[in-house]
A protein has these predicted regions:
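Gram-negative bacterial Sec-dependent N-terminal signal peptides
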Residues: 1-33
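Predominantly soluble domains enriched in secretory-pathway, periplasmic, or organellar proteins
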Residues: 34-463
Length: 463
C-alpha cells in the first residue's frame, strides 16, 4: 500500500498562497461559500491522503481525516473539483472517503490539490501523485526462483567468502517482539540457520530489532543496524552469535550499513543526525562521524549507502533535501553535494565505479536519476513504476536493478538509462542485493495483518 499524506508546515504554506487564493475565489461563487472573511478554523488539522497506486485512467480513493464534524470540503485542481459533483461533508469523526476519476490523459507526477473547507473556513494543499503505467517485459532474459522466509524482511547481504546470504527482518513498531537474522543458501534459498536478537533489558517486550545489513568477510562478521535503538550490532557469520551490541543512541535512527572490509571500516547512515557514523571493524570501536552539509538550510537525512571501495568513495542520498552526498573515505569527510532536480523523497542510491555513474531512486516522484559523476550532471531522468525504494548496481551484467515497491516490480536499467526489463517480482519488494555473479536477491516486505503470513526472497539470474 502506498500512501501520499498531506504534510503542510507553516514554512511551506506561503508557496501555495496563489493556489489557495484561486480555490477560495472559485468556492465563493458556489453554494459552498460562506462569504468573505467569515470565522476561520485557526486550529484546522484536516488532511487528505490518496490510497494505493494511481495511474492515468484509474480511480483514486481519497481519505480525509482531522476535519470538524459537519465541515464541508471541496477538493480543487486548476479550480475544478476532482470528485465531480460529490458533496463532501466530514462525518461525526471528522472523516470522509471519496472517489476521484483520473483522466486517461492525466500527466504523471505530483499534482497540488487545494482543500477548501467551510463551516468553519480553512484551506490547505495536498499532493496527489499520479504514477506511470508500466508493462511487464524482458522476462525471457532472466530465471526466477522464490522461497518463503519470515515476516517483515528488510534487507539482505551476500558473503562471497562464505557463499551465504544473510537476511534481516523486523515486524511492527516498538516494542518490537519479532525480529530475526537468517543465514540462507544462495542456490537453494533454504534457511540454514536463524536467530532472534537479544531482548532489550531497558524496554519491556522489545528485542534489538534488525533492519540494515552488511558483511565483513575479513573478520568473519555481519554488521546490522538496530534502528529502533539508534544503534548497530555485530554478529558472527559462522554461528550467528552476537559479537557486540553497541550502546543505544550510538547512531541516530541508524538506517543502512556498509563495510569496507579491506580498510577495517563500517559506515552507518544516521538518518536522525545528518551524518554517517564510522566504526573500526577490527577493534569494534566507534570513530568520529562524518558530517553531511546540505546546500540548503535543512539538515540532511541520509538513507541508503553505496560504497566504491576501489576509489575510496561513499555515496548517500538525503530523503528530505533532494541531494546526494559524495564522501572521500581517505580524508573521512564530505567531498561534494549533488543536487537532484525533479525528485522528492530520494531513498535508494547505487554507484557504477568503472563507468563513474550514480543512480538515485526517489519514491515521491517515481523516478531514477542517472548522474555522470565526472561532471555532476544529470544524464537522464527515468520514469519507473510507483514507489522506487532501493537500487543496486550489478557490475557483472552492467545493469542497475530498481526495487519498485508499490508496483511489486523490479526494473533493470542499462548505462544509457534505458529500461531493458520490467519484471513481476512479488509483493512489495523492499531491497535488492547482488552476489556479483549475475544473481540478484530481492527481499519482500508485504504489509499483512496475518500473523502467519511470511515474506519471501526472490533470486533473479541474468541468463
Amino acid at each position: 500500500m502506498q500512501i501520499n499524506t498531506l504534510c503542510i508546515s507553516n514554512k511551506k504554506a506561503f508557496k501555495r498562497v496563489s493556489q489557495i487564493a484561486l480555490a477560495v475565489a472559485v468556492a465563493m461563487g458556489s453554494a459552498h461559500a460562506q462569504g468573505i472573511f467569515d470565522q476561520a478554523d485557526i486550529d484546522f488539522k484536516g488532511n487528505v491522503s490518496s490510497m494505493g497506486v494511481i495511474t492515468p485512467g484509474s480511480e483514486a480513493t481519497l481519505q480525509g481525516r482531522g476535519f470538524t464534524p459537519g465541515q464541508e470540503i471541496l477538493l480543487l485542481s486548476n479550480g475544478q473539483s476532482i470528485v465531480g459533483d460529490q458533496k463532501l461533508v466530514a462525518n461525526q469523526d471528522g472523516e470522509f472517503v471519496s472517489k476521484a476519476a483520473i483522466p486517461a490523459n492525466a500527466a504523471v507526477g505530483l499534482h497540488p490539490v487545494v482543500i477548501q473547507a467551510a463551516k468553519p473556513s480553512a484551506a490547505a494543499v495536498f499532493d496527489l501523485k499520479i504514477s506511470p503505467k508500466t508493462e511487464i517485459f524482458g522476462v525471457e532474459q532472466f530465471t526466477q526462483q522464490s522461497a518463503p522466509m519470515t515476516r517483515g524482511l528488510y534487507q539482505s547481504a551476500y558473503s562471497p567468502k562464505e557463499n551465504k546470504l544473510y537476511v534481516v527482518s523486523s515486524v511492527g513498531r516498538p516494542p518490537v517482539q519479532q525480529s530475526e537474522l537468517l543465514k540462507v543458501n544462495p542456490e537453494t534459498l533454504a534457511i540454514e540457520a536463524r536467530i532472534t536478537p537479544a531482548a532489550d533489558p531497558n524496554r519491556e517486550n522489545h528485542v534489538y530489532a534488525l533492519y540494515g545489513v552488511s558483511v565483513d568477510d575479513v573478520n568473519g562478521n555481519i554488521w546490522v543496524t538496530t534502528t529502533r535503538n539508534n544503534s548497530v550490532a555485530v554478529y558472527k557469520q559462522s554461528d550467528l552469535s552476537l559479537v557486540k551490541q553497541f550502546d543505544d543512541n550510538t547512531v541516530a535512527h541508524a538506517r543502512d550499513v556498509v563495510v569496507d572490509a579491506a580498510n577495517n571500516r563500517a559506515y552507518a547512515s544516521a538518518f536522525g543526525a545528518g551524518e554517517v557514523a564510522v566504526f573500526d571493524t577490527k577493534t569494534l570501536e566507534q570513530l568520529p562521524s562524518i558530517a553531511l552539509n546540505s546546500k540548503g538550510r535543512q539538515a540532511p537525512s541520509p538513507m541508503s549507502l553505496s560504497l566504491d571501495a576501489g576509489n575510496q568513495k561513499l555515496y548517500t542520498v538525503s530523503i528530505n533535501t533532494g541531494e546526494a552526498f559524495v564522501i572521500d573515505l581517505k580524508e573521512q569527510k564530505q567531498e561534494n553535494v549533488i543536487s537532484l532536480p525533479g525528485t522528492r523523497s530520494g531513498s535508494g542510491i547505487a554507484v557504477a565505479p568503472t563507468e563513474q555513474l550514480l543512480w538515485v531512486a526517489s519514491q515521491g516522484t517515481d523516478n531514477v536519476l542517472l548522474i555522470d559523476l565526472k561532471s555532476g550532471d544529470v544524464v537522464k531522468d527515468i520514469k519507473v513504476g510507483a514507489g522506487p525504494l532501493n537500487i543496486v548496481w550489478d557490475d557483472k551484467d552492467k545493469l542497475a536493478f530498481v526495487a519498485v515497491r508499490a508496483n511489486g516490480q523490479v526494473t533493470a536499467l542499462n548505462t544509457k538509462g534505458e529500461a531493458v526489463a520490467n519484471l513481476e517480482a512479488g509483493r512489495q519488494p523492499n531491497h535488492i542485493s547482488t552476489d556479483g555473479k549475475g544473481n540478484l536477491f530481492v527481499v519482500h516486505k508485504a504489509a499483512s495483518t496475518d500473523k502467519n503470513a511470511v515474506d519471501q526472497v526472490t533470486r533473479l539470474h541474468v541468463k
